[in-house]
């Protein structure tokens, strides 16, 4: 039969729902494996020439932990890539073309020291309406407002940003 441009687009665009891959939109369980399974399916569809939209649930809260993160050798400017070239990656988009990640105002909380999102050897990748943060920051920002020298010692007085949680132990 006769096909319009819209019909051709509809057949070549596939929507993958994250919930179909057993992701937990309530933030109780780690969704890292589910997200990566969905991205593996997206890659397979991409290899067939299809465009893919990966759909998060509306206003979801997703956890991604270091324990289930993928590993890749990555050289970046802000890490020790010579001694530690292998990095954990929370969400890895690799070798995919024509992917839209529709977050639907969802939020990912990354737990553990890892690269949060890596897009590698991919083309035409869009990320919409998705935010993320870390459960515990691996670095802390502060402002130094005074430096004192006493003999061979240097003392810094700093002011932490109000949103930083901290404790000094010893």
Residue ranges and their predicted role:
Residues 1, 7-8, 133-136:
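Extracellular, surface-exposed passenger/stalk and repeat segments of large secreted bacterial proteins
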Residues 1-5, 41, 156:
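Short intrinsically disordered, low-complexity coil segments enriched in acidic
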Residues 3-35, 60:
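Right-handed parallel beta-helix/beta-solenoid
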Residues 10, 100, 169-170:
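Short, intrinsically disordered, charge-balanced linker/junction segments flanking boundaries
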Residues 13-15, 53, 124:
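A residue-level signal for beta-strand positions that form part of recognition/binding surfaces
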Residues 21-26, 36-39, 43, 48-99, ...:
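N-terminal extracellular ligand-recognition/capping segment immediately after the signal peptide
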Residues 114-170:
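Right-handed parallel beta-helix
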């Amino acid at each position: 039969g006769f096909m319009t441009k819209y019909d051709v687009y509809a057949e070549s665009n596939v929507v993958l729902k994250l919930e179909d891959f057993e992701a937990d939109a309530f933030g109780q369980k780690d969704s890292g494996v589910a997200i990566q399974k969905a991205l593996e399916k997206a890659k397979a569809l991409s290899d067939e020439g299809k465009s893919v939209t990966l759909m998060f649930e509306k206003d979801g809260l997703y956890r991604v932990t270091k324990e289930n993160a993928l590993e890749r050798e990555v050289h970046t400017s802000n890490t020790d890539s010579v001694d530690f070239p292998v990095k954990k990656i929370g969400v890895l988009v690799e070798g995919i073309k024509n992917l839209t990640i529709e977050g639907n105002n969802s939020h990912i909380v990354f737990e553990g020291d890892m690269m949060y999102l890596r897009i590698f050897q991919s083309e035409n990748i869009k990320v919409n309406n998705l935010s993320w943060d870390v459960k515990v920051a691996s670095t802390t920002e502060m402002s130094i407002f005074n430096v004192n020298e006493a003999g061979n010692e240097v003392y810094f007085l700093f002011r932490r940003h109000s949103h930083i949680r901290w404790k000094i132990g010893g």
